[in-house]
Design a protein with these regions (language model features):
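Active-site beta-strand termini and strand-to-loop segments that position acidic
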Residues: 168-170
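Polymerase palm active-site segment centered on the conserved acidic dipeptide of motif C
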Residues: 155-162, 184-192
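Chromodomain-type histone methyl-lysine reader module
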Residues: 1-150, 154-161, 166
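Histidine-centered acyl-transfer/condensation active-site motif
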Residues: 173-187
Length: 192
């Protein structure tokens, strides 16, 4: 939502956060597939004590937990190539597109203001107040974690105590690990 730059200064005591375009080639040299996204430049900022912020990332032990469950559920460590076999274990990898943009900003959180990109005709006069999280802002990872945790718990999953990014569905016997915007799930059709 576009607002006057003075609103950002009056509500936060700071100017809006600068933004930049990030271009990534999702293809290869032969068939390039460039994608661009606008990202905020807040992550490398320092807090009032001078300490730098960092984005939290869950440990890879969560992924190891899900894959270990997939290997040990039925006790058979031999591959089962029959797609209709009831002992077959399925491991699914899902990447959520634009994950942080799916997380709404809690109205109780302080507002986050960003500069408009130079291509916008209102750049320099107005700034943007975020209604959803944006890559590069400090609360983005926490907002996304809150969003997917609430959704999975609402679907009947139980959140792990030792590793809060591992979820288990006791009825469907599905284990899921979340690492940023990547979901890894395992499920056995039926164990003997």
């Amino acid at each position: 939502m576009k607002v006057p730059i003075s609103e950002a200064r009056s509500r936060t005591g700071r100017p809006p956060i600068s933004v930049r375009w990030v271009d990534v080639n999702k293809g290869d040299d032969m068939v390039p597939n460039y994608r661009s996204r606008l990202a905020a430049r807040q992550m490398k900022a320092l807090d009032s004590s001078g300490a730098s912020y960092f984005a939290p990332a869950p440990p890879l032990e969560a992924l190891r937990t899900v894959l270990s469950l997939a290997m040990t559920k039925c006790g058979n460590h031999q591959p089962d190539w029959d797609p209709l076999s009831p002992q077959r274990v399925q491991v699914s990898l899902v990447d959520v597109k634009r994950a942080y943009f799916n997380a709404k900003i809690d109205p109780e959180e302080p507002a986050t203001f960003v500069k408009l990109p130079s291509e916008d005709p209102d750049a320099g006069k107005l700034c943007g107040r975020l209604l959803r999280h944006m890559y590069g802002t400090r609360p983005a990872a926490d907002g996304w974690q809150e969003e997917y945790s609430t959704m999975l718990v609402g679907l009947g999953f139980r959140q792990g105590g030792a590793s809060p990014n591992v979820f288990y569905h006791p009825v469907r016997k599905i284990a899921t690990s979340v690492h940023g915007d990547d979901f890894t799930s395992e499920r056995t059709k039926r164990c003997p």
